[in-house]
Amino acid sequence: VHTEVARAPWNDRRLLLRIAIKGADKAVDALPPANLVFLVDVSGSMNSPDKLPLLKSSLKLLADRMRPQDRISLVTYASGTTVALEATSGAEKAKVVNAIDGLRAGGSTAGASGIELAYRVARQAFIPGGINRILLATDGDFNVGVTDFRQLKDLVAQRRASGISLSTLGFGTGNYNEQLMEQLADAGDGAYSYIDTLLEGMLRQAQSHGQ
């Protein structure tokens, strides 16, 4: 067990206590096949080193660990929404990396419509008995479309019955909305992580089964 205390990067009046407990490792090859849809915020607020550039580097790490039986998709949202990468086998790493390299920040944040599109993409690539998960990567600054907390949570909660979970990955500071990220993950039967460095946490969350 390892503990660490540090100031919260989004509020210097708050402290974070990190408790790390090492459990039994489960070989990646033993995990069910994964259908991962990364819903990436590419709005203007993500255009800083600790946001989109860090996210892209983390995604490349994940792509390198994907197996041929795994599928990865990229959905982006800013003023509008786009499927930047259709469901692609983990064996096609160059194709995945090229799509990641093409991500650019700019525009406002239509997060709700992005969530809807991500669920459609996840359903199309659904793997029965596999890990079917949307990973929402954002600084939490939703400012276009459905912006009411309850509406967003209800939207995600309605979709969890489809067997597709939603986890959230928080990046950066400033407009970062920790409360919304935690509540969306809870509603989506997923987990929440704050990513401030190139850590394994993002990889573990993507590869884990269930919460």
Role assignments for model-derived ranges:
Residues 2:
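Conserved P-loop/Walker A NTP-binding site and adjacent catalytic elements of P-loop NTPases
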Residues 6-211:
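Exposed acidic/Ser/Thr-rich ligand/metal-binding surfaces
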